[in-house]
Amino acid sequence: MFEKEITIPAFFEPSAVAMLVQTASKFSSRISLVVEEKTANAKSIMGIISLNMQEGQTLTIVAEGDDAQMAILTMENFFTGV
């Protein structure tokens, strides 16, 4: 299992949720997003929306599986715009 904490950037808007799900869905690993003790499957649009992510909050990305390390890096890059 791999984890990475990031701060949700100002540019992350609800319209980016579909792109986030598409990015997460490229991996076979289970990817979860954790915000303020709420956890959601990163491959679920409704799950991500339920997190109600806001600029400046701490987000923990958790991945388990064969490609977990690459999934964490890719998800981090999605949020940081790298």
Give the ranges of each region predicted by the language model:
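C-terminal structural segments of small proteins and small subunits
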Residues: 50-82
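Intrinsic-disorder/low-complexity, polar/charged segments enriched in Ser/Thr/Lys/Arg/Asp/Glu/Gln
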Residues: 1-5, 58-60
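Compact, glycine-rich, soluble single-domain proteins
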Residues: 5-41, 46, 50-51
